[in-house]
């Protein structure tokens, strides 16, 4: 046997065994490595050369025995489209373990599509190649754009044919996160282990994500957990600020899809708008627009309310004190989101974030004229003609001496536009990855004009977005 030159840690499984069910990925009839993210592997101390061996591929499928990995399916609950489900968990996923990057930060190595677990609830536990490659390219694009996100380490085709309306090739995604602790993780701890387990999970969350609070864990007080909650709120606000600037619609902001770290997770029904509008939604199952673009800050606030419900006994010496602390912190969330959004647009416009008047004028024009935000911001960055309706704004904006160099670092030339992603995936599922690799190269170097051909910068043909619909692909 070709021995692995590394060993994953089992930090979550050891710290929270009641929330981790030991499991193994299912056997694949003919596994083949489709793509491997060498740079990400190196950054985590994983050897890409070994990962390409037959033993390495089996490792990436969750098939290696101990001691190399101690894979587990994580338990969590969740509100899905507002409806609470007490036991969700990793129904088609596994946490292989954690790898430590050079800076000492632990990162979850997590599978998606690895087969049934005890949480599958009758589903087959599998994933198909198109949606898996979709998550790979969009998550890596988001990372390159500076958005907090899970990342993609590898895609493996399984050699299995799977029925999803039509027959599709099976695949497993290997993704990476600073952790996959969710709002739904706290909901599960609250109903399964009460405040004792919730406090244990909160303490573990502090050690993984909020080092400034670690010193307080020797003698934690209500202020420790209030600070934790406020730090989580800030992470969510910062992330939604970046989504808003980029015109990104997540599409499934359930509490089980909201990570405590603030990293974007689960890209199944997401999309990038090409007409900037508040009512934009693309998910085939979001019938009533719960998760439409303009609702994203509000929905994250709703999710944060569900989180703080699980922490109330930790936030004060009495129930009334805990409730007051929760309400005060949560009451600041709308302002945190607005501040984050204004900051993002100020940076995109090359202005100081204190220039709220210009930023607000720009945002009003976005909703009035519905431009392609990517093209618009690059036209400002490159000092080319703005679209109709923005002429007067641009004239006044230029008098404020915008920082064009700073703008070049945040306003992308390339994003994973919906029509380009769909074209690349259509070819990929029949074995032609040329368009996929071309698009991946461009969107992972989004500010470099030489990273891809000019046609990858262009919006779709008129009418495409009106009919465009996304699917989870499960």
From Swiss-Prot:
Q: What is the stated purpose of this protein?
A: Nucleotidyltransferase involved in the post-translational modification of proteins. It can catalyze the addition of adenosine monophosphate (AMP) or uridine monophosphate (UMP) to a protein, resulting in modifications known as AMPylation and UMPylation.
EC number of this enzyme = 2.7.7.-, 2.7.7.108
Q: Which residues bind ATP?
A: 89, 91-92, 112, 124-125, 175, 182, 266
Protein's organism: Corynebacterium glutamicum (strain R)
Q: What gene is this protein a product of?
A: ydiU
Sequence positions that bind Mg(2+): 257, 266
Q: Name one GO molecular function term.
A: magnesium ion binding
Reaction equations catalysed: L-seryl-[protein] + ATP = 3-O-(5'-adenylyl)-L-seryl-[protein] + diphosphate; L-threonyl-[protein] + ATP = 3-O-(5'-adenylyl)-L-threonyl-[protein] + diphosphate; L-tyrosyl-[protein] + ATP = O-(5'-adenylyl)-L-tyrosyl-[protein] + diphosphate; L-histidyl-[protein] + UTP = N(tele)-(5'-uridylyl)-L-histidyl-[protein] + diphosphate
Cofactor needs: Mg(2+); Mn(2+)
EC class, as a word, reads transferase
Q: Where is the active site?
A: 256 (proton acceptor)
Span of the secretion signal?
A: none
> What keywords are annotated for this sequence in UniProt?
ATP-binding, Magnesium, Manganese, Metal-binding, Nucleotide-binding, Nucleotidyltransferase, Transferase
Protein name as it appears in the record? Protein nucleotidyltransferase YdiU
* A Pfam family matched in the record: SelO
